[in-house]
């Protein structure tokens, strides 16, 4: 087909000539293209164009309401977890209050709703025998402050509720934990406001 893929390369600019995108600037080098497609965040893609070619201003983007971001925790346990399904929703707090904290008055929710996923319940290859892999997701407003201290505070909040609802202690059985949040969505995926 004559297609050439450039991987692990950050695009610095979309080069437009005569109202047509004709090349990309990658690592200071111009790479010609017949067609340019972007699967990146719309805002980020626009920032790769010269300002006079952008369809929307920064003011436009600042006023938009975006889909939620999230705080994700990837967790490994050295035991099997009881009283959960592969997909488990913890909607034991007020949905309207959490939604308000995402869309109307963006801030960290006091009592967040969260989702827990235990892939090792249905695919044993995702954790060693007798252990469990999981991830937890808290929907958040995009663009809010993101610090390690806030992440830890919210991990403890959801673990308190998780242990209470499922009737078991699990924190002492955590052998791996990693988080991914607003800052990471921005830096990894160029997601506007994370």
Predicted segments, located by residue:
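General small-molecule cofactor/ligand-binding pocket signal
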Residues: 4-6, 175
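Residues within well-ordered alpha helices
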Residues: 1, 161-162
């Amino acid at each position: 087909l004559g297609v050439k893929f450039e991987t692990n390369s950050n695009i610095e600019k979309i080069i437009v000539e005569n109202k047509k995108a004709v090349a990309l600037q990658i690592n200071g080098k111009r790479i010609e293209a017949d067609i340019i497609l972007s699967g990146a965040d719309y805002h980020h893609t626009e920032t790769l164009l010269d300002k006079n070619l952008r369809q929307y201003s920064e003011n436009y983007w600042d006023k938009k309401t975006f889909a939620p971001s999230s705080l994700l925790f990837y967790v490994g346990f050295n035991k099997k977890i009881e009283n959960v399904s592969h997909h488990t929703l913890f909607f034991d707090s007020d949905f309207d209050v959490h939604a308000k904290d995402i869309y109307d008055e963006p801030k960290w929710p006091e009592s967040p709703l969260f989702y827990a996923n235990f892939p090792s319940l249905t695919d044993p290859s995702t954790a060693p025998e007798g252990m469990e892999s999981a991830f937890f997701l808290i929907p958040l407003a995009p663009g809010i402050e993101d610090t390690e201290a806030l992440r830890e505070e919210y991990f403890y909040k959801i673990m308190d509720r998780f242990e209470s609802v499922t009737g078991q202690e699990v924190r002492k059985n955590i052998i791996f934990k990693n988080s991914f949040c607003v800052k990471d969505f921005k830096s990894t995926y160029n997601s506007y406001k994370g």
